[in-house]
């Protein structure tokens, strides 16, 4: 019995010494890939959306910071993955870079367009809106407001 145990012990020593062979050395592994967001699509009725901010007398925008009434608008997104979504608006910034410049600066040189979230807080240009939950069908409606804002006194 002792001889059998001794033989097993010697066998284990021989096996363990085999595992302690020379190390493999340095191995370099380069991994490449891309991770992309699954994005929503804009409802076809909202792709070329026009939001009419109205016609206002210059007396409505006499001083810097004066605004016109808020005009609501919404964007409908479809085919979204489960979870929540947010969007951001880009465009030509006004002198206050949180606001959108008008296309025709001769029209109103001291006026810009202000965007607001559904809670009416300002949505700065280039910043993500608050998130909205996607419904079970992959749809979500994002609600916003827009208005004119005077950048300085003496709107022309």
Regions found by a protein language model. Give the residues of each.
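Bacterial N-terminal signal peptides
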Residues: 7-16
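Mature extracellular/passenger domains of Gram-negative fimbrial/pilin and adhesin proteins
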Residues: 2-4, 19-156
């Amino acid at each position: 019995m002792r001889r059998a145990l001794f033989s097993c012990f010697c066998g284990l020593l021989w096996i363990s010494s085999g595992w302690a062979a020379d190390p493999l050395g340095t191995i370099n592994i380069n991994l490449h890939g891309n991770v992309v967001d699954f994005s929503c699509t804009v409802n076809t009725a909202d792709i070329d959306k026009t939001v009419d901010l109205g016609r206002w007398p210059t007396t409505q925008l006499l001083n810097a910071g004066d605004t016109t009434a808020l005009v609501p608008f919404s964007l409908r997104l479809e085919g979204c993955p489960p979870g929540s979504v947010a969007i951001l608006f880009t465009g030509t910034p006004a002198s206050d870079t949180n606001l959108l410049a008008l296309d025709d600066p001769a029209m109103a040189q001291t006026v810009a367009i202000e965007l607001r979230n559904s809670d009416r807080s300002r949505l700065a240009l280039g910043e993500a809106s608050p998130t909205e939950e996607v419904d079970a069908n992959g749809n979500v409606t994002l609600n916003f407001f827009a208005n004119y804002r005077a950048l300085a006194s003496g709107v022309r």
